[in-house]
Amino acid sequence: LWPAVKKGTLPNGLTYYILPHHKPEKRAFLWLAVNAGSVQEDDDQRGLAHFDEHMAFNGTKRFPKDAIVKYLETIGMRFGADLNAYTTWDQTVYQLEVPSDKPEFMQKGLDILRDWAGDVTYDPEEVAKERGVVLEEWRLGRGANTRLFDKHSKVLFNGSRYADRITIGQPEIIQKAPRDTLYRFYKDWYRPDLMAVIAVGDFDPAVMEKQIIERFGDLKGPAKERARPSGGMPEATGTRVSIETDREATGTVISVENLVAHRPEASLKDYRRLVAEQLYGMILNERLASLARKPDAPF
């Protein structure tokens, strides 16, 4: 880790990372990262990791119904720009930006993270309302590219849970899953040893650490913790070919994908390598796109 980052682990297993950073001024970025996503879903929960993410904005112990969004709007924050979340195969991350010039704003921000970590209420009325929102997100995402990827992923992720755990899930489960099935995922996987609180911004790091310890120290995991299922590695059994078509596709894509060993980004050197690789890919893409725009393009 960068020496300026303060890392700690609470007795309950929750990890926190604190980095004082004075640009932009008077701003604090607060994240809650959960080491669980759609890969951890049971067969009757496909799509519910993402649904759980939605429910975090629909009522908690301190902030009933949509009070989180309404409160943040009163201090100048906007949903989407300053308040957001996302779910992937392996993680669920909540992101919050608050002004740091007044202590109560940061305290409220940490209260929100604490409620997301262990006190989402799952009001049956709110669950019923949010089903339609999640189903509409599923419907709007069912374009040609998504349909092609769904087919391609069966080959790409062959032999692993990734092939059967696309994050948006299955509409019939989203539509019919009982409230308790949705809540079961939350209780199984939103537990301290699978969580990290990340605070970066223009604040006193000692005060921030004290407030994190005070708020998150009482979090408890389930009495009987489940073993966390991993996605597993796709089977590497020679060359596999996937040819997929869709009548609504607007172009042709040819890709070559290689299975390589995971390389963690655990140091500045690792991060520098990652940035260099990303820049290489961007430069190559721009050059190919520039060639493609020419009237005498060779492809």
Protein language model features and the residues they cover:
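Histidine-acidic residue clusters that define the catalytic metal-binding segment
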Residues: 1-6, 94-97, 151-195, 228-231, ...
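Short, solvent-exposed loop/turn segments at the edges of secondary structure
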Residues: 11, 25-27, 87-91, 129, ...
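An aromatic/glycine/proline-enriched structural segment found at the starts
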Residues: 159, 196-251, 263, 290
